[in-house]
């Protein structure tokens, strides 16, 4: 039987807090389930909604001025959400409402509200790069890798983009400046800051408080547009979340990383924004081309990749003094694949202190083998490299998340060989190791190459797990 709690036997203060929040006397079950949330509930109850409404209106005026909605509509949506618990009787939904309201109450002002106040002066820190001089070289390199055969019968996943992306991009530009210790960008927008001729869509970010930021942003969009916003977590992308609207249109995504990982990511400072060092991004692009899907993307739009590649090549030429004369020495390093055990052995003794690198194509197998080694010095760089690295007895152990292309039976394609070398160089950059000679040889090994057809490729590691999501409208959190 669901009875009201006896006010004589229950702590009066806690009961009053819950009663005020729910707008009704809680049932016995509600009281006992919610009493440990009393502190959070009290913060929500005393939260100044008028100031919050003002901040959202200012965010709307600055970043969403073209969205047709009135100030009164925004206020009504906010007040409606902060009173939603009064019409909710499901305990699970009440917990979700409390959790999400708590995020808004405790973080919104510092994360998004701060974007409405006067910004610090922008420190102009751009260098003029002669990207044009690298365009022909980039085109030659990419042409030799343009070997994917497109299967016209293959159904490609559609990536529908929301019309709000341009508004969110405007907000993100300011966010990256205000929060440049906890949020950095990479990808097309970061290269656009170096070369304004680069085209970009949404802004790719790494940050240390991704979940909180995305929840705050989702509510901002909800309060301004009235649309239901859903946050999704993808199991095979590590610490990745994406915001989509109710029609499954992509708005923005983000990878979350630890602060200690953020501290070691190579980065440069441009106009008050930190971007991932283009040298590091170039290595990631070389690694990425081992993925068969990315080669298909290259085949569809080579000029898009050419602009990015030329920009990064010019950056490394200018920054590291790389001479592009075709001197490749021992690059790419020798790679031997064991297809049965799904391990590639890379001979590294010509460049590094460890003599070889065992590259696992199954992450769980690597984790098991590291445990067997009883070694506790592995480095986990999360989504920055999608792998741990361990050096033990002059052997590096690591995981490679992409496909391995083969040019013949049992023979690693040179595109994948370079991708594996780039993966090792990412570790060298992250740990402040030596990489410049190896980088020079790797880039020169991409010059003047003929196209080599793909014989076959290994499959990617299958990632376990389920999709998670936060549905604001339905008060559901599944993670």
Swiss-Prot record:
Family annotation (InterPro entries): PolyA_pol_cat_Poxvir, PolyA_pol_cat_sf, PolyA_pol_nucTrfase_Poxvir, PolyA_pol_nucTrfase_sf_Poxvir, Poxvirus_polyA_pol_cat_C, Poxvirus_polyA_pol_cat_N, Poxvirus_polyA_pol_cat_N_sf
UniProt xrefs under CDD domains: polyA_pol_Pox
SUPFAM superfamilies: Poly(A) polymerase catalytic subunit-like (SSF160957)
Molecular function GO labels: ATP binding; metal ion binding; poly(A) RNA polymerase activity
Induction section of the entry: Expressed in the early phase of the viral replicative cycle.
Binding residues annotated for Ca(2+) 1, in chain numbering: 202, 204
Annotated catalytic residues: 202, 204
Keywords: ATP-binding, Calcium, Early protein, Metal-binding, mRNA processing, Nucleotide-binding, Transcription, Transferase
Catalytic activity annotation: RNA(n) + ATP = RNA(n)-3'-adenine ribonucleotide + diphosphate
Function text: Polymerase that creates the 3'-poly(A) tail of mRNA's.
Family recorded in the similarity comment: Belongs to the poxviridae poly(A) polymerase catalytic subunit family.
Oligomeric form and interacting partners: Heterodimer of a large (catalytic) subunit and a small (regulatory) subunit.
Name this polypeptide is given: Poly(A) polymerase catalytic subunit
Originating species: Cowpox virus (strain Brighton Red)
């Amino acid at each position: 039987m669901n009875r009201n709690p006896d006010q004589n036997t229950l702590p009066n203060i806690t009961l009053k807090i819950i009663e005020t929040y729910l707008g009704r006397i809680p049932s016995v079950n509600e009281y006992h389930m919610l009493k440990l949330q009393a502190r959070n509930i009290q913060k929500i109850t005393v939260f100044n909604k008028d100031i919050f409404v003002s901040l959202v209106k200012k965010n709307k005026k600055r970043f969403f001025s073209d969205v047709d909605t009135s100030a009164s509509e925004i206020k009504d949506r906010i007040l409606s959400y902060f009173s939603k618990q009064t019409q909710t009787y499901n305990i699970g939904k009440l917990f979700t409402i409390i959790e999400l309201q708590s995020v808004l109450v405790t973080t919104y002002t510092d994360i998004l509200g701060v974007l409405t106040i006067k910004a610090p002066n922008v420190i102009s820190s751009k260098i003029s790069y002669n990207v044009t001089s690298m365009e022909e070289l980039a085109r030659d390199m990419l042409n030799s890798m343009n070997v994917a055969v497109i299967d016209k019968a293959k159904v490609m996943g559609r990536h529908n983009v929301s019309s709000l992306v341009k508004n969110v991009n405007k907000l993100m530009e300011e966010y990256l400046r205000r929060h440049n210790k906890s949020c950095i960008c990479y990808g097309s927008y970061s290269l656009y800051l170096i070369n304004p001729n680069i085209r970009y869509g949404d802004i790719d970010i790494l940050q240390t408080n991704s979940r909180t930021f995305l929840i705050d942003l989702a509510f901002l969009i909800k309060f301004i547009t009235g649309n239901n916003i859903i946050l999704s977590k993808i199991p095979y992308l590590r610490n990745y979340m994406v915001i989509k609207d109710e029609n499954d249109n992509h708005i923005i995504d983000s990878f979350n990383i630890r602060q200690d990982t953020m501290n070691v990511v190579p980065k440069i400072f441009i106009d008050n924004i930190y971007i991932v060092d283009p040298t590091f991004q170039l290595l990631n692009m070389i690694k990425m081309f081992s993925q068969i899907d990315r080669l298909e993307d290259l085949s569809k739009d080579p000029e898009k990749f050419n602009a990015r590649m030329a920009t990064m090549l010019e950056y490394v030429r200018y920054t590291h003094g790389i001479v592009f004369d075709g001197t490749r020495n021992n690059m790419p390093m020798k790679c031997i694949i064991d297809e049965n055990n799904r391990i590639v052995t890379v001979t590294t003794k010509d460049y590094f202190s460890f003599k070889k690198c065992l590259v696992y194509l199954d992450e769980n197998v690597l984790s098991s083998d590291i445990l067997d080694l009883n070694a506790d010095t592995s480095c986990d760089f999360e989504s920055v490299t999608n792998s741990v690295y361990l050096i033990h007895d002059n052997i590096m152990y690591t995981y490679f998340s992409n496909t391995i292309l083969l040019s013949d039976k049992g023979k690693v394609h040179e595109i994948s060989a370079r991708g594996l070398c780039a993966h090792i160089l990412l570790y060298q950059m992250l740990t402040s190791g030596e990489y410049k000679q190896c980088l020079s040889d790797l880039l020169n090994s991409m010059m003047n190459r003929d196209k080599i057809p793909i014989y076959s490729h290994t499959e990617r590691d299958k990632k376990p797990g389920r999709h998670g999501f936060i549905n604001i409208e339905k008060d559901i959190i599944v993670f």
